[in-house]
Regions:
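Hydrophobic alpha-helical elements and their junctions with loops/disorder across both membrane
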Residues: 66-67, 141
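Short active-site-adjacent helix-start/loop capping segments
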Residues: 13-14, 56-59, 83-87, 103-104
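A glycine- and small-aliphatic-rich helix-loop capping segment at beta-alpha/alpha-beta transitions
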Residues: 19-26, 68, 89-100
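Structural motif
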Residues: 73-74
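Solvent-exposed alpha-helices and their adjacent loops that cap or buttress functional pockets
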Residues: 40-43, 68-69, 86-87, 154-156
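N-terminal short beta-loop-beta anion/metal-coordinating cradle
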Residues: 1-64, 70
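Mid-sequence, gly/pro-rich, charge-dense loop/helix-turn segments that line enzyme active sites
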Residues: 84-178
């Protein structure tokens, strides 16, 4: 299975680029528009990694190129995000059960908040196979990460839940509650 990995900013993918280069396998770099896609083998798995820029439009552009040009089977978003769940801490991994647009509003046309016109629901259910793979991957590396952070207040955890995506930065209590 070939996996596409998207990071919005350089800090979210630079270690992945370095690991790919250090893997000892050939790395192909392909430029499409202003984007550079790095294709190779990471930990025995074929991957294509891209730093795509911030926002849903950039993520959609990268996703379409990864599917149409590189024929990836799955897409993973790597990087930081805001956290609406008070349990979340730095280094935690969030595995999506489903996703929703938090800034989509077609309610005037009779749709639910977050629902894209023409879809049956505002929620996009995550692929169970990919969720299971993410859980298994986390468990494989969690012990080593925890051991390296022994004595630290930051111990990574895996949390499953709904991911709300949008281009609106959530910085106030009213938006957060919505």
């Amino acid at each position: 299975m070939k996996t596409g990995i998207i990071g919005a900013v350089a800090q979210e993918v630079e270690l992945l680029f370095a690991d790919l280069e250090a893997s000892g396998t050939p790395v192909t770099k392909t430029t499409i528009g202003s984007l550079e896609f790095h294709e190779g083998i990471l930990d025995g798995c074929p991957v294509v990694i891209v730093c795509g820029g911030v926002g849903k439009v950039n993520a959609a552009l990268c996703t379409q190129i990864l599917v149409s040009v590189f024929s990836v089977d799955a897409i993973v978003n790597s990087g930081s995000a805001g956290g609406l769940d008070p349990r979340l801490r730095v280094l935690d991994m969030v595995v999506s059960t489903d996703a929703v647009h938090h800034d989509m509003d077609a309610t005037w046309f009779g749709y639910a908040p977050g629902q894209v016109p023409g879809t049956a629901s505002p929620f996009f259910t995550a692929d169970a196979r990919l969720r299971n793979a993410a859980q298994a991957s986390f468990e494989r590396v969690a012990a080593g990460i925890r051991a390296s952070l022994e004595g630290s207040d930051t111990v990574p955890a895996m949390i499953e839940g709904r991911i709300a995506s949008g281009d609106l930065f959530v910085a106030d209590a009213a938006t957060r509650a919505r």
